[in-house]
């Protein structure tokens, strides 16, 4: 089966028909991860792409998570939500921010797409939040689709006389965290660089001389990756960018360093629990996580669900994006948990960088 053949067969049966929720596909596509991506990118499908996307979800044991609407399980539930909901926002374009990254996860493949929503109204293009989609592919099916983006801007109104949109509360989805482990061991060259750096200043202007795999292993290491000075050293001096929904976008190593060293010590006792494997393909890495507050009594409170993407070029980190929803951070219960965990972040900290 090729992607073209798959689309040909679909159109032979369904061309010109409106997408329907009364449909269940029980035969796998017989396509690999790239093939399924090629299918949903086929321009011949037009608005029927939503039906085809739903067709590709495994009938049972699949999940679609959306930062506004939460989690849906199994092809039937995913289809019943996906098709009517996306039809309501057909004026929104999802503009790619980078090429799709494919990762070998040892089980069928994972893809990462970064995008920005753009509303097209009366000929005007209105930029909306950026987001990321992580999909996992298994045996001819999509089994995992998680769309993470900031819903905070959708939950407020720029006009004080206009009520905010009627949206459901932010999702309380429960995520199964993977056991904490050092799944990115450091090479001899990475350890040597870290040992040498400890004797140097905090300013990095020369390439660290490390492979992209070394850069990846350092920033995802449970100890080295928590040292914000080390992370800053690995960012390109001028051609680097860091995206954060709360603080905006920072460019260049100096600005990123100031922000990391200023803000990160104020977040309190937090743990980033992985909800998927840390993946690396030579150019980019991805990690899905839940930020968890560690309270003095030993209990924990999950705060936000996020996805982090890193990109590497010429021996530097050139791009870092942490995608998460800020809506939970406006919840009084979550704010109380963050304060109990020692967070001292204030609105002034955010305003200083945005």
What annotation goes with each model-predicted range?
Residues 2-25, 86-207, 264-354:
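A beta-strand edge to alpha-helix "cap/lid" segment located at domain peripheries
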Residues 40-44, 53, 57, 63, ...:
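Broad hydrophobic/π-residue packing in well-ordered secondary structure
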Residues 73, 225, 251, 325-326, ...:
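General structural signal for secondary-structure boundaries
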Residues 76, 203, 214, 227, ...:
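Intrinsic disorder/low-complexity segments enriched in polar/small residues
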């Amino acid at each position: 089966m090729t992607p073209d053949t798959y689309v040909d067969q679909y159109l032979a049966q369904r061309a010109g028909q409106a997408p329907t929720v009364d449909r269940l596909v029980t035969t796998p596509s017989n396509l690999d991860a790239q093939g399924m991506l090629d299918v949903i990118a086929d321009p011949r499908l037009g608005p029927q792409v939503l039906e085809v996307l739903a067709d590709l979800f495994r009938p049972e044991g699949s999940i679609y998570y959306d930062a506004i609407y939460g989690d849906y399980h199994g092809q039937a539930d995913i289809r019943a939500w996906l098709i009517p909901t996306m039809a309501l926002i057909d004026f929104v374009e999802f503009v790619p921010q980078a090429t799709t990254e494919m990762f070998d996860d040892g089980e069928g493949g994972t893809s990462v797409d970064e995008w920005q929503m753009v509303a097209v109204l009366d000929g005007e293009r209105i930029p909306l939040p950026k987001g990321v989609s992580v999909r996992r592919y298994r045996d001819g099916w999509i089994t995992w689709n998680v769309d993470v983006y900031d819903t905070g801007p959708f939950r407020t109104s720029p006009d004080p006389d206009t009520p905010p949109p009627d949206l459901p509360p932010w999702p309380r989805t429960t995520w199964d965290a993977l056991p904490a482990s050092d799944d990115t061991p450091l090479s001899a060259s990475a350890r040597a660089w870290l040992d040498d750096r400890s004797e140097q200043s905090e300013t990095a202007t020369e390439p660290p001389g490390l492979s992209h795999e070394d850069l990846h292993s350092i920033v995802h290491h449970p100890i080295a990756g928590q040292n914000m000075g080390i992370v800053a050293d690995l960012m390109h001096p001028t051609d680097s960018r860091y995206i954060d929904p709360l603080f905006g976008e920072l460019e260049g190593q100096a600005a990123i360093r100031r922000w990391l060293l200023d803000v990160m010590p104020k977040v309190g006792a937090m743990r980033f629990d992985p909800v998927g494997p840390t993946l690396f393909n030579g150019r980019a890495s991805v990690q899905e996580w839940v930020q968890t507050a560690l309270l003095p009594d030993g209990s924990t409170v999950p705060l936000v669900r996020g996805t982090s993407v890193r990109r590497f070029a010429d021996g530097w980190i050139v791009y870092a994006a942490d995608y998460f929803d800020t809506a939970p951070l406006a919840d009084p219960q979550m704010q109380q948990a963050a304060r109990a965990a020692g967070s001292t972040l204030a609105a002034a900290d955010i305003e200083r960088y945005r």
